[in-house]
Amino acid sequence: MRLSLSAWRPPDWLVYGAIVAAALAGSLSRRERAMAPEPPPPVPGAAGMPISPDSPLAASPITSVTPAAARGAQTGFSVGEAGVWMTAAAGLGRCRTPGVVAAEGRAAPAVRRPGADAVLVVTTPGAGAPGVPLAAMHDLQAGELGFVPGFPKGGPGEVAARLLGPQTRRVLARFEANEPVLAWAEIGHTEGLKGARPGLVGAPVLDRAGRAVGVLLGESPRRGRIYTTTPDGLRRALAAAGVTPGAAGAGQPIGTDNYGRAADGLRRDLRVVQVVCLRAG
């Protein structure tokens, strides 16, 4: 259901920020490029192996993922070992039972939490991975770096970007969000990653300290833009869901020279995962 935006009017600083962002975007697109190497290949035979007892999701019931569900997979991430996960709400709007993928073709059923707007919070009670730490609530500055690890086309990949600034009401309506949406200019991605990347939706945007500062809501490949929530939006989503994520894992410093390796580690530890719909509502 599309949310009404009539009660929210963009303040002057947002309008001016959009103008500054456009100028910054043009400047960035002309001079910066930071590519990441291709991720390591999958381990042969891993698809049919049992879930390891050391897996963060080993204590959860596991169900098979149908090919149709796998094709619709998006990215999500852990925010605490208590089994609390975040992703984008749009792709799972009519999903009754989401699933957190534990291994290829297998997922742990998750419980939807109430209060979702642009961000969806789900839980896997009794099983969870070390959380991605959340950045403190603060205003990001134009030009800051962000790194997006995930599963762009059903497989591993990542994007690097620089923050442009808050977007206008028209962009808010596109994402059915009633809070600010941030735009970032892409400056790099995994080698060989081309075209639209629907599977990256729901991924965390990480700052240079490895802390989540937003959730990826969508992209504009032709313009080289990605769109995310704000840091405040993450904590509001948790509060609306009525969950306490528990202790998060340590953040890892990330830069343009190592964001590919950092993303590989987050995926390997199931701190960044695929999220699928196991049963439609």
Where are these regions (language model features)?
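N-terminal Lys/Arg-rich, disordered targeting/topogenic segments
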Residues: 1-6
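A conserved glycine-rich beta-strand in the N-terminal activation segment of trypsin-fold
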Residues: 60-89, 105-109, 202, 260-262, ...
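Sec/Tat-exported extracytoplasmic proteins
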Residues: 82, 89-90, 95-96, 150, ...
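Conserved active-site neighborhood of the chymotrypsin/trypsin-like protease fold
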Residues: 82-158, 195-196, 244-253, 258
